[in-house]
Amino acid sequence: MKDRLEQLKAKQLTQDDDTDAVEIAIDNTAFMDEFFSEIEETRLNIDKISEHVEEAKKLYSIILSAPIPEPKTKDDLEQLTTEIKKRANNVRNKLKSMEKHIEEDEVRSSADLRIRKSQHSVLSRKFVEVMTKYNEAQVDFRERSKGRIQRQLEITGKKTTDEELEEMLESGNPAIFTSGIIDSQISKQALSEIEGRHKDIVRLESSIKELHDMFMDIAMLVENQGEMLDNIELNVMHTVDHVEKARDETKKAVKYQSQARKKLIIIIVLVVVLLGILALIIGLSVGLN
């Protein structure tokens, strides 16, 4: 009776272990499904930012090509800039949250952890690439706007150096150079453009500063992932090498097997021939007797 009780207890423990294993597997699958859902959402956000950056470039060109840009064009650019910042913040927060969870699970080396690291790294690099393009577009727009201001100042008879122009932009007061402009129709139009371009640059610089910390955050994250990516690449290369070696060994084995089969057939034929000759000799001997 006591032995039977022990058997039942052992069976129950085994069933409990099996149930726990199933629950862990289900939980892990659900976790990875949620992870891939976040990955897809983040990827779509980055793609949308990329689209917005291309739209912003077009609006920059329109604004630069017109002496006095339409207010609607500037409003559209403002809305686009706000949307880019909103989505970029969302992506940054998602990536940092993923990074935190990966660091917490670092002690457990598993296949899904490597997958999460790889996916996170790919998205981080893609995000930095898109934001770098946006930053380059902003800097280009600033330089070209500054060039337009410089040309308009020359039209009014005021020549300025790059250093003087930067001083005006940093002060936030275009009156430093526009206060003594001659009152004429040409000068008024030039003055209007100077003030408009100056406001564009001030707004732009505010946007660049807001995005700077975010950009550096993710750029540092990607830099830290460099070694990890190199290790992943090395592991992949080693895996490919092993596959190639295994394939070569398989070819050799097939070749040797084929050669062995041929030798076996030859031996069998020789044995059959020898047996035939032996049978013939025995037959002749019996006949003679």
UniProtKB/Swiss-Prot annotation:
Segments crossing the lipid bilayer: 264-284
Residue ranges of coiled coil: 32-111
Keywords, alphabetical: Cell membrane, Coiled coil, Disease variant, Membrane, Neurotransmitter transport, Nucleus, Transmembrane, Transmembrane helix, Transport
Biological processes per GO annotation: exocytic insertion of neurotransmitter receptor to postsynaptic membrane; intracellular protein transport; long-term synaptic potentiation; neuron projection development; neurotransmitter transport; organelle membrane fusion; positive regulation of cell adhesion; positive regulation of cell population proliferation
t-SNARE coiled-coil homology domain residues: 191-253
GO CC terms, sorted: apical plasma membrane; azurophil granule; cell-cell junction; dendrite; endomembrane system; extracellular exosome; glutamatergic synapse; growth cone
Superkingdom per UniProt: Eukaryota
Positions on the Extracellular side per record topology: 285-289
Molecular function via GO: arachidonate binding; SNAP receptor activity; SNARE binding
Residue ranges annotated as Cytoplasmic topological domain: 1-263
SUPFAM superfamilies in the record: t-snare proteins (SSF47661)
CDD domains named among the record's database cross-references: SNARE_syntaxin3, SynN
Illness association: Retinal dystrophy and microvillus inclusion disease: An autosomal recessive disease characterized by early-onset, severe retinal dystrophy associated with intractable congenital diarrhea. Intestinal biopsies show loss of microvilli, microvillus inclusions, and accumulation of subapical vesicles in villus enterocytes.
Family: Belongs to the syntaxin family.
Function in brief: Potentially involved in docking of synaptic vesicles at presynaptic active zones. Apical receptor involved in membrane fusion of apical vesicles.
Matches recorded under PANTHER family: SYNTAXIN, SYNTAXIN-3
Subunit structure: Interacts with REEP6. Interacts with PRPH2 in rod and cone photoreceptors. Interacts with ROM1. Interacts with SNAP25. Interacts with VAMP2.
The protein's name in its UniProt record: Syntaxin-3
Source organism of the structure: Homo sapiens
